[in-house]
């Protein structure tokens, strides 16, 4: 295809409405993914016993680490497709789509190999308890069989989101997620597969979601359509995908590593505090992922409009997405402060554990909205094609800073508030640096476009 459909263009129309309409399905997709993951844990805990539950739980860090890398890689695909689509360069869009498919598949196969071969060493690295180790190794190996499929789903999601269609990925994720729940119950209760059953259900669901989204791309009547006869690795395009995607993926991976040090700080308290923290931490994923929908929308809208040379819409896209994400974080965080005990109740029946969880909520509830300034600005810089600078800043500000905080301020005071305050402090510090970098990058981008327009008139 060499056409460009106007219906999904982000370069025209009311921005506030468009960003909201694109972001809502993304937010629902993110929340559904969390709920489906929670269902895995619930089924194992309810029907397979505490050892199986512990085995699955002990793999969470590595699952987050590697899936985060794939998500970061897909962000690079999203930005590049949006850039070329906005610039109305159909051939470049097609090259990006077909090269990105191969890059994503290669990344998924690489992670599959790491999971199959390296699971024992990785789990021992975290001092996984010996009684949990066999189940954890089995879970990771079966779960990682689905990594190529997960990589392909993220690829398709990135392409559709880049052109403003976020409803299809939501539909396919809903179908796969419902299947995942049914298979969880079947494999664990009927087949008595325990840990392997939950992992197998996830793998099958990932294959289904990947198949659905790839099939949808083959039916598209536009330049971003997937044609298996055109699959070819275009080297210059591949380099651009990797330049945009690898820093984002590396950033997500480093976040997971930094959080290990924070968890070590939590583990230095008694078991009640550890349980309370685990219960309260469920709010993090729900609120972060809801806010994250506006970050992906921000990158897509900015990239399309930058490609189209519409600088006024580039700047407006950033401020509108920032306002939405900040507002959502403030509302959800405020609601958590008011209804925190009710939120924690489904996770524990012990009032002392709820009291411990509230200590985290009382710090984090008002702080979630601060993260919008950091994350939305990072997305904005990536929308302009800048990835290395924002990644270096966030690694220093939100990863290195957090580790240093744990070993200095927290080590000195050794209180729960002194540990949890590292989140808003690191977000504020990183946000200030990211905003300064974005202003610099935006001015450079404006100058580059103005020079390009001047040369075009000659």
Language-model features, listed with the residues they occupy:
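Hydrophobic transmembrane alpha-helices of multi-pass small-molecule transporters
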Residues: 65-68, 180-184, 210-214, 286-289, ...
């Amino acid at each position: 295809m060499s056409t460009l459909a106007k219906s999904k263009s982000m370069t025209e129309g009311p921005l506030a409405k468009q960003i909201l309409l694109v972001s809502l399905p993304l937010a629902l997709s993110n929340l559904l993914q969390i709920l489906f993951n929670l269902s895995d844990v619930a089924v194992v805990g309810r029907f397979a016993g505490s050892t199986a539950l512990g085995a699955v739980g002990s793999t969470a860090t590595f699952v987050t680490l590697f899936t985060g890398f794939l998500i970061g890689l897909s962000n690079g695909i999203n930005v590049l497709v949006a850039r070329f689509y906005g610039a109305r360069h159909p051939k470049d869009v097609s090259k990006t789509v077909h090269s990105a498919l191969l890059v994503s598949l290669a990344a998924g196969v690489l992670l599959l190999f790491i999971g199959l071969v390296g699971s024992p060493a990785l789990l021992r690295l975290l001092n996984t308890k010996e009684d949990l180790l066999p189940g954890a190794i089995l879970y990771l190996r079966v779960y990682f069989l689905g990594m190529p499929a997960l990589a392909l789903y993220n690829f398709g999601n990135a392409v559709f989101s880049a052109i403003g269609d976020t409803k299809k990925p939501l539909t396919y994720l809903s179908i796969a997620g419902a299947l995942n729940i049914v298979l969880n119950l079947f494999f664990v209760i009927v087949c008595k597969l325990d840990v392997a059953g939950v992992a197998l259900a996830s793998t099958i669901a990932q294959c289904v979601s990947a198949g659905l989204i790839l099939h949808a791309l083959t039916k598209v009547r536009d330049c971003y359509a997937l044609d298996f006869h055109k699959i070819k690795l275009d080297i210059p395009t591949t380099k651009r995908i990797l330049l945009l995607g690898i820093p984002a993926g590396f950033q997500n991976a480093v976040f997971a590593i930094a959080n290990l040090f924070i968890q070590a700080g939590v583990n230095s308290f008694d078991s009640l505090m550890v349980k309370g923290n685990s219960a309260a931490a469920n709010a993090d994923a729900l609120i972060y992922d809801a806010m994250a929908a506006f970050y992906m929308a921000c990158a897509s809208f900015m990239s399309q409009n930058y490609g189209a040379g519409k600088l006024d819409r580039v700047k407006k896209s950033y401020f509108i997405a920032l306002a939405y994400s900040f507002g959502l974080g403030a509302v959800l965080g405020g609601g958590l402060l008011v209804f925190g005990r009710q939120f924690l109740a489904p996770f524990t029946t012990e009032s002392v554990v709820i009291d411990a969880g509230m200590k985290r909520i009382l710090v984090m509830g008002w702080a979630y909205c601060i993260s919008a300034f950091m994350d939305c600005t990072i997305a904005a810089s990536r929308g302009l094609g800048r990835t290395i600078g924002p990644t270096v800043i966030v690694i220093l500000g939100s990863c290195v800073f957090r580790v240093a905080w744990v070993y200095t301020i927290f080590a000195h005071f050794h209180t729960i508030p002194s540990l949890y305050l590292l989140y808003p402090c690191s977000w504020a510090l990183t946000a200030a640096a990211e905003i300064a970098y974005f202003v610099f990058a935006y001015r450079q981008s404006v100058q580059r476009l103005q020079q390009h327009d001047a040369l075009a008139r000659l």
